[in-house]
Design a protein with these regions (language model features):
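Short glycine-rich or small-residue beta-strand-to-loop segments that form or flank ligand, phosphate
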Residues: 82-88
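A generic secondary-structure signal
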Residues: 68-72, 129-133, 143
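Conserved "HGTGT" condensation-loop signature of ketosynthase/thiolase-family condensing enzymes
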Residues: 1-81, 103-105
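Conserved beta-strand segments that form the floor/walls of ligand-binding pockets within enzyme
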Residues: 10, 84, 115
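Conserved small/polar residues in nucleotide/adenosyl-binding loops
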Residues: 142-149
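Conserved catalytic cysteine-centered active-site region
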Residues: 37-60, 88-140
Length: 149
């Protein structure tokens, strides 16, 4: 396993927002047998999940969490240099959700924004990218959109 070490970088604040609707895993008997549900809960420990309403996007949850940070800490919108949005459920295919959040939060147009399409490991991957962004004096970026008929 690679060992990554970052100096002089830290996390100043963490906020979380979760949807209000709770679905118990044991209530999914219309989709899975009781035996399958028991095995799933035993293997994962997931006894319930939170589900957003149909009109709630991933950016809505991020916006609420970001507002908590701005309202409850000394971190100011104008201090934000980069915004990383990580999800496997972006608001739209295009434009990127990070740009939507940048605008909705009133961040500077100079703020660098990134969308990272990942699931479970996305948070760690995003931390790695943010730390690298803060430590490296230069960066190389490739992008490609192979348009096909």
């Amino acid at each position: 396993m690679a060992l990554l070490k970052f100096n002089n970088i830290g996390i100043k604040a963490i906020a979380a927002t979760v949807p209000h609707r709770v679905i118990k895993t044991t209530s999914l008997t219309d989709y899975y047998s009781s035996e399958e549900i028991e095995k799933f809960v035993a293997a994962t420990g997931v006894e319930e999940r939170r589900f957003a309403a149909p009109d709630v996007c991933a950016s809505d949850l991020c916006y609420q969490a970001a507002c908590q940070i701005f309202d409850e800490t000394d971190i100011r919108r104008e201090d934000i240099d980069a915004l990383f949005f990580i999800s496997q459920s972006p608001d739209y295919k295009i434009p990127g959700t990070s740009g939507i959040l940048q605008n909705k939060l009133g961040l500077s147009k100079e703020t660098i924004v990134y969308d990272i399409n990942m699931s479970c490991s996305g948070f760690i991957h995003g931390l790695l990218m943010a730390y690298n962004f803060l430590q490296q004096p230069s960066c190389l970026l490739y992008t490609s959109e192979p348009t096909r008929l």
